[in-house]
Amino acid sequence: MSKLVILAVLVLLPLVTAEHGRDEQAMQPEKKTMWTLWSLTRRGECDGKKDCITNDDCTGCLCSDFGSYRKCA
């Protein structure tokens, strides 16, 4: 009987974890969409177009790395 219970757990465990993984993957596009909507609402020097060296060069945002450039975002 105990072997049957262990076998059932071993069979059902991957199914439960696979469903959990699908839920996490389904939520990622929403996060990306929200990030895109948020970045589109940025105006002024915080839109990623103004060059900067330190955070003091940006008003209301941070100086961030974009590839080999630093921009206010």
Swiss-Prot record:
It is found in: Secreted. Keywords: Cleavage on pair of basic residues, Disulfide bond, Neurotoxin, Secreted, Signal, Toxin. This is Conotoxin Cl9.2. GO terms for cellular component: extracellular region. GO terms for molecular function: toxin activity. Residues 19-41 form a propeptide. Expressed by the venom duct. Disulfide bonds join C46-C61, C52-C63, C58-C72. The cysteine framework is IX (C-C-C-C-C-C). Residues 1-18 form the signal peptide. Its main location: secreted.
